Amino acid sequence: MSRRPLAVLLALTLATPALAQEAAPATPATRKGEDGIFSLDRMIVTGAGQAQNQFDASYAITALTAEQIDKLAPLNLASLIGSMPGIYAESTGGEVQNVYRIRGIPDEGSFAVIQEDGISPYPDNNGYFYKTEGLVRPDLMVESVETVRGGPSPIFASNAAAIVNFVTRQGGDTPEGAVRTTVGDTGLYRLDGYWSGKLADGWYLAAGGFVRRNDGYRDVGFPADEGGQFRMNLTHTLEHGKLTFTAKHLDDKNAFYMPIPLYDPRDTARSLDPLIDRFTGTLSSAQLKRASIVSSDANGAPQRELRDLSDGRHMKFNHLGANLDLAFDNGWSLSNKAIVNRLDMTFDALYSSNAPQDAAAYANSRRAAANAAFPGLSSLGYVYTDDGSRFDPASTDGLVIQGQYRAMNVRADSFADDLRLHRRFDWGGDSHDITLGVYGAYYARSYNSRYQSYLLEMRQNPRTIDLLGYDAAGNVVGGVTKDGVVIYGADRTQGKAYTSMLAPYIADTWQVTDKLRLEAGVRHERYRYRAWSMLRSTGNLGMADTLADDAARLFTGARARTALDVGVANWTAGFNYDINPTVGIYGRASRAHRAPSEGANEDNVNIPTADQFELGTKLNFDTLDVFATAFYTKYDPYNIGTSAVNPQTGAAESKDYRGSVTNPGIELAAVWTPAQWLRLDANLTYNDTKVSDLTEVVANGAVAVVDVDGNMPNRQPKLYGNAGPTLLFTTGAFDWETSLRYAYVGKRYADLENTTELAAYDTLAANILVRNGPWDVQLSVDNLTNTFALTEGNPRTDTISGQGTRAPIYGRPIYERNSRLVVTYHF
C-alpha cells in the first residue's frame, strides 16, 4: 500500500496561492481561534441537571469544541476519546468497534455510554458484535463533545461509569455552514457539509452529513470504508421553550482489522515480514468476496449462502427523535427526549485464528483421520482452491494458516424516553437545585451467526488452499478440506431477545455557602428480559467426500426460552469547594452497575459493579488551566469470555472466567499559554490496575483458581498520555497554527498471566493549519516517525496464558505513517 505524504504537501503548496488570491484577509469577526485543547471557561451540559461552567463541575469532565476536534484530527471516535485523560483507547481496529477503557475498567467500552444530545442511540452499549460507538459518527454537525469520567454518570445514564456526549448543531437566526473535502494517502476521499439557519418565523434547521471512501490503513484487498450519513435537527420555538425534531440515516461499510502473524512459531526470531507486511498486511482475501457459507438450518439440515467479505461491518441505522425543552414562570423547567431507532447490520470478517503451522506437520496431524475416512488413501497434498493447481508450501516458507470467517445478521429496534423536571429552591437560606427524572426503554434484538474456518497459504491477501487425499494412482479419494474450508459450522447461533427497563432518578445540588456545594443522586433501574435461542448439537452435514463437515454445530429444531427480572441501584455523592475564583477542589464517590446484556437468564446473571472514588483540584489562571484528579476504582466481578479456535478441529471453543480488578490512579489535563504565539497542552494518566481472585467457571458451576493475583489486565498500560506545543503566527493575510503531538503508551501484556509483553511505544503527529478568511487548509500526519508497535496480541488464543513467548509472534499493529489534507470553506 502506497503512502504519498510528499504529494499531499505539494497539493497544500499549490492550493495556498489560489486561496490567497480569492479570500479576503482574516479578521477576528470572520474566524476566531480557540484558546486550547482544554478550557475551564466553557459551559457544559453533560452530567448535570442544568448547564454549568466547567470550572464549577464537581467531577472530571473534558469538553472539546468542533474546532478543537478538527485540530486533533482523530482517525475515528476511539482515537478522539483516547486523547482525553483517564481513557485508554485502541483505535487500530478500523473505523468502528474499537476498544476503550475508562480508568482501568477492563470491559472494552461497554461501561461507557456514548450519547448524542444527552441520550444514547441504543439503550445497551454492548450489542451483538456492535457498540453504540458505531452508531455515532463525528462530522461537521458536531458542535462539541463532553466526556464525564465517573462522577454523576450512573445517575444520568444506565450502565455508565462514564458518559461521552456529542452535542450537535442547532439552527439559529444567523445562517451559517461549511463544506469540507478530505483526501488522504490511504486512498481516502471524504466530503462533509452542514447548513444551519432560520427557515421561517419560529422554525430553525441544522442539517448535514458526510460521504466517504477509503482504501484503508491496511491492505484488505478491497475498499475498507465506504458510505456516509445524513442528519438534521428541526427546531420550533414555543412560548416557554422549544421543540426539536431529530432524524439521522447512516449507511456505512467498515473493515475490521485483525491481528496478523509476525514471526515464525518454529523459529520465533525469524520475521514473517517477507510474506506479510507488518504495517499494512492482512489475511483478508478478495477471493472471499464470494464466500460460500454452509451451515445448519433451523432443523439441522445443511443450507448454503453467498457472503461478501468486502461488506465488512455494514450498518444501516435510522433514527427519529423529539426533544422538548420548557421553562415555566414558576421556576420549573422540563426536558423530555424521545427516540425511536432501527439498526440492520450484516457483519462479515475473517478473524485471526491460531499461529501459522508447518505445512508438513499440519498434514501429518490429519493423516489418521483421513486414512479412516477414505479407503485407499496413499498420500495427502495441497492445491489451490480456485484453480486446482498444486500449492507448494516452500513458496510460503513451509507454512499454512487458518482463519475463521464470521458471517452475521443483526436487527435491533429500540424506543427510549428520558423525562426530567428541574427547579431551584431556597430553603433555610441555602439553595437546592433538584432534578427529578425517569428513563424508560424497550429494545429488541435478533441475531443469526455462522462461523466457517478456512485453510490459507501463509502470505498477505492469501488464496485459500485444500488438503486433498490421493490413491496410489494419483486420483482424489477425499479431502481433509473442501473448497478451502477446514470446518463447516465451526459455530452456529440464532435467537431473539426483548428487554424493557424503567429507571427513576433524583439528583440534588445543595449550595451550602458561596464556596461550598454538596451534590448527591440516586437512580434505581428495573430490567425485564425475555429471550429465545436455538438449541444446538454437534454432527455431520452429510458431505462424504471431506472431513470438513464432521464436527459442525447443528440446530436441533428446538428453542430454549429464558426470562429474568432484575433491579440495580446506582448512587453518587460529592462536594465542590472554591478556595477562590481561580482555585477549587472537589471530591466524589459513585457506584455504577453494568446490567446484564440482552438474553440474560437466571443461570448466567452476573452484574458487574464499578465503585469509583475521586479527589481533584482545578486551577483557572490567566495562562494556565489544570484539572488534576486522583481516583480509585474497584470493578467486581471482572468477567472474561474467551473464544479460541481448536487447532485440530477448527471449531470455536468458549471459556468463561471471573475475578476482580482494582485501579488507583492519577489523571491530569493541562494547558499553558505563556505567550500569544505559544500553547502547550498535556493529558496524562497513571494507574496501577491489578487483577485478583480469578477463577475459571467449569462444568456444573464448579470453579478452578487461576493464579494471576497482582497481575495487570491484558492490554492495559500503567502510563499513557499525550502532550505537545502549538505555535501561532500570522504572515500577511494568513493565520497559521503548527503543532506537534507526542503520544506515549506504556508496557502492556497480551495475557492475564503477564507472560507475553506488548512493548511500550511512542508516536509523533504533526499538524499544520492555515486560515485565510472563510478558508481553512489543514495537513495532518500521523505516526510521523513510522513507529512499529502492537495494540494487542491474538485475543482468540492468548487472553489467559499468552503466546508461549515473551515477545508476541502474533498481534495487531498500529497504523503506519499516513497523512490527510483537509480543505474547509465556511459561509
Residue ranges and their predicted role:
Residues 120-149:
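Short acidic/polar hinge/loop motifs at secondary-structure boundaries
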Residues 144, 151, 163-198, 205-220:
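Short strand-turn segments of transmembrane beta-barrel domains in outer membranes
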Residues 235-237, 242-319, 346-410, 465-497, ...:
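Acidic/polar loop-and-plug regions of large Gram-negative outer-membrane beta-barrel proteins
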Residues 410-412, 431-475, 493-635, 673, ...:
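Structural signature of Gram-negative outer-membrane beta-barrels, strongest in the C-terminal barrel
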